[in-house]
Curated annotation (Swiss-Prot):
It catalyses: (R)-pantoate + beta-alanine + ATP = (R)-pantothenate + AMP + diphosphate + H(+). ATP binds at residues 30-37, 147-150, 176, 184-187. GO terms for biological process: pantothenate biosynthetic process. The keyword Cell inner membrane does not apply. Catalyzes the condensation of pantoate with beta-alanine in an ATP-dependent reaction via a pantoyl-adenylate intermediate. It is found in: Cytoplasm. This is Pantothenate synthetase. Beta-alanine binds at residue 61. The gene is panC. It comes from Nitratidesulfovibrio vulgaris (strain DSM 19637 / Miyazaki F). (R)-pantoate binds at residues 61, 153. InterPro entries: Pantoate_ligase, Pantoate_ligase_C, Rossmann-like_a/b/a_fold. PANTHER family: CYTIDYLATE KINASE/PANTOATE-BETA-ALANINE LIGASE, PANTOATE--BETA-ALANINE LIGASE. One of its GO terms (molecular function) is pantoate-beta-alanine ligase activity.
Length: 283
């Protein structure tokens, strides 16, 4: 495995691969790997000829007062895990490499970015879209792999690629969970022992909502209220950011649950902001 830091070197390498007809798969990450990241890399290895894993804590997707400085980092460990999971290149640029002085171009998908996480993080997805598009231009992948835990991010990147005619297949892979149901996240390290004990109830509440829908409940407000009641009792240390039942592609709020519905939630639990989601209907 090569470790590259220079964007131009990455681009030249990937240009050679493309000229040779190689299928490059990109796995964009911010590092501090867990089994969820490893599952993305393993999938990439299974479908591609070449695998590029990017590791970049992107400052443009953090807002004021967020955890940019505190975000966990362990490059040596991450490099070992990337290599063990089949990466051909680990791309680890510095912020000045990706956003040099004078950078003035930003990409946004306002119709999808202004809801859910975008309400409390209004500039987040602008930073995500811009860095992902830059990575697409550098790695020139045929496929890019993202986790479904960040469902809104996945929907936005898919729309960006479709609207801008980007020839990349954007693949979403299932959430990887701890044995007790907590969605794996690099930010779980922020949780205290007591907070960690409560955190799996986020998943359990989502499962409650799905069970209600499977049992015949179709009123989205009723399902959301049942989940909210459960979380009030089971997450006394948490502060609700949002609980929303939306269409999984358009992210538009639903009043009635019919063929496709996603419940997406975010809670602040101590120093951690935890997101999770579950399809209540549809595949």
């Amino acid at each position: 495995m090569q470790i590259l830091t220079d964007p131009r070197t990455l681009q030249q390498t990937c240009l050679r691969w493309r000229a040779d007809g190689q299928h490059t798969v990109l796995v964009p990450t911010m590092g501090y790997y867990h089994s969820g990241h490893e599952s993305l890399m393993s999938y990439a290895r299974s479908v591609g000829d070449k695998v590029v894993v990017s590791l970049f804590v992107n400052p443009t997707q953090f807002g004021p007062g967020e955890d940019l400085a505190a975000y966990p980092r362990d490059l040596e460990r991450d490099a070992a895990l990337a290599e063990a999971n089949g990466a051909d290149i680990l791309f680890t640029p510095q912020p000045a490499d990706m956003f040099p002085a004078g950078h003035a171009t930003w990409i946004e998908v306002p119709s999808l970015a202004g809801t859910l996480c975008g309400v409390s993080r209004p500039t987040h997805f602008r930073g995500v879209c811009t860095v992902v598009m830059k990575l697409f231009q550098l790695a020139m992948p045929r496929t890019a792999v993202f986790g479904q835990k960040d469902w809104q991010q996945l929907a936005i990147i898919r729309r960006m690629a479709r609207d801008l005619n980007v020839p990349v297949d954007v693949v979403g892979r299932p959430i990887v969970r701890e044995q007790d149901g907590l969605a794996m996240s690099s930010r779980n390290i922020y949780l205290s022992t007591e907070e960690r004990a409560q955190a799996p109830n986020i998943h359990h509440g989502l499962a409650l909502g799905r069970a209600l829908v499977q049992g015949g409940e179709r009123d989205a407000a009723a399902v959301a209220e049942a989940m909210r009641r459960y979380w009030r009792e089971s997450l006394p240390l948490a502060q609700e950011d949002y609980i929303s039942i939306v269409h999984p592609e358009t992210l538009e709020p639903l009043a009635r649950i019919t063929d496709a519905a996603l419940c997406a939630v975010a809670f602040r639990l101590g120093k951690a902001r935890l997101i999770d989601n579950m399809l209540l209907a549809g595949e």
